[in-house]
Curated annotation (Swiss-Prot):
Keywords: Lyase, Magnesium, Manganese, Metal-binding, Riboflavin biosynthesis. It comes from Methanocaldococcus jannaschii (strain ATCC 43067 / DSM 2661 / JAL-1 / JCM 10045 / NBRC 100440). Changing residue 112 to A: Reduces activity 50-fold. Increases Km for ribulose-5-phosphate 10-fold. NCBIfam families: ribB. This is 3,4-dihydroxy-2-butanone 4-phosphate synthase. GO terms for biological process: riboflavin biosynthetic process. Mg(2+) 2 binds at residues 26, 164. Homodimer.
Length: 227
């Protein structure tokens, strides 16, 4: 069993894995868990040990069925009325051409939406809604803005973009899980992202699968080309 296959099995068990994108991109490691298995404990670990922004990444097919746009598209549309939004357009991202950010949500049964319990509840209920195919109930169950940031994966996943969003959703797809993942960047104590060596040591200490973006991309594309 290779490293990607080990990661797939870990995701199926509801375990956290670590994914490093590449030296040429963000140079960051994300904690990753399959959203259908999310628990408040996962959120707590991400919040305390990773410290970045906890986001939930969705397959583009799911986004299309839910009607969820990219945030840049919302800004562009709204800029017709609010000129400042045109000035804020993110056309100078140093590591990519376009951000994967979409909307933020809370489940309507949450209180503030920010607690570990509330965020886990929102994410799990989103995965349940998608798994059950209840796309028309999205607006009934969730409100926006909220405390769970949604990321919209690019069409074709890693064939067209090699961000943590696409790589982790591709892993969930390979695992035959609901293709939604919850991810969080690992931050260091020096004001920067945690180094690759530090995140590798963290993985070893906590017995977590650690893999690179290159491993995921090659495995996914190889399977895609064969199929």
């Amino acid at each position: 069993m290779n490293n990607v296959e080990k990661a797939i099995e870990a995701l199926k068990k509801g375990e956290i894995i670590l994914v490093y994108d590449s030296d040429e991109r963000e140079g960051e490691t994300d904690m990753v868990v399959a959203s259908q298995f999310i628990t408040p404990e996962h959120i707590r670990i991400m919040r305390k040990d990773a410290g970045g922004l906890i986001c939930t990444a969705l397959h583009p097919d799911i986004c299309n069925k839910l009607g969820i746009p990219f945030m840049v598209d919302i800004l562009e549309f709204a800029s017709q009325k609010f000129k400042v939004l045109r000035e804020l357009y993110p056309n100078d991202i140093p590591y990519d051409e376009k951000s994967s950010f979409s909307i933020t949500i809370n489940h309507r049964k949450t209180f503030t939406g920010i607690t570990d319990n509330d965020r886990a509840f929102t994410i799990k209920k989103l995965a349940e809604l998608v798994k059950e195919g209840r796309f028309n109930d999205f607006g009934k169950e969730f409100r926006s803005p909220g405390h769970v940031t949604l990321l919209r994966a690019a069409e074709g996943l890693v064939k067209n973009r090699q961000g943590h969003t696409e790589m982790t959703v591709a892993l969930a797809e390979l695992a035959n899980l609901v293709p939604i993942t919850t991810i969080c960047e690992m931050m260091g104590d020096d004001g920067n992202a945690m180094s690759k060596n530090e995140t590798k040591r963290y993985a070893e200490k906590h017995n977590l699968i650690y893999l690179s973006g290159e491993e995921i991309i090659n495995y996914y594309l190889d399977k895609y080309l064969k199929d």
